Amino acid sequence: MPTINQLVRKERKKVIVKSKSPALKECPQRRGVCTRVYTTTPKKPNSALRKVAKVRLTSGFEVISYIGGEGHNLQEHSIVLVRGGRVKDLPGVKYHIVRGALDTAGVAKRTVSRSKYGAKRPKDAKK
């Protein structure tokens, strides 16, 4: 615990919080163009083919984004909306593509957690 005199001589350092998604430049989402759509494998205990896309953002950054949900319609030159949020078992993937926005279609036949996957409410859905 510093004395008052020590604080007068040298003030406390401000804590600088580093952004976990710097490519978004303090925005909630950013628009971008897919430059490459491919699959990659996760880290050690897990095994799968995860769908990812390399996206050139309007902020000038080129980032790797995860495509959530089952099936997608993305290809090169698709316009997508990118949000923050990393994928724990994919190194270097710190962004997600928003489903149901711009060129990205929502997940077909999705009945639960629909808002996260851009799926409309089915006609035969009962409350």
Curated annotation (Swiss-Prot):
GO terms for cellular component: small ribosomal subunit
Modified residues (3-methylthioaspartic acid): D89
One annotated GO biological process: translation
SS bond partners: none
GO molecular function, one term: rRNA binding
Keywords for the protein's UniProt record, in alphabetical order: Methylation, Ribonucleoprotein, Ribosomal protein, RNA-binding, rRNA-binding, tRNA-binding
The protein's role, per its UniProt record: With S4 and S5 plays an important role in translational accuracy. Interacts with and stabilizes bases of the 16S rRNA that are involved in tRNA selection in the A site and with the mRNA backbone. Located at the interface of the 30S and 50S subunits, it traverses the body of the 30S subunit contacting proteins on the other side and probably holding the rRNA structure together. The combined cluster of proteins S8, S12 and S17 appears to hold together the shoulder and platform of the 30S subunit.
Subunit text: Part of the 30S ribosomal subunit. Contacts proteins S8 and S17. May interact with IF1 in the 30S initiation complex.
UniProt similarity note: Belongs to the universal ribosomal protein uS12 family.
Protein name: Small ribosomal subunit protein uS12
Organism: Campylobacter fetus subsp. fetus (strain 82-40)
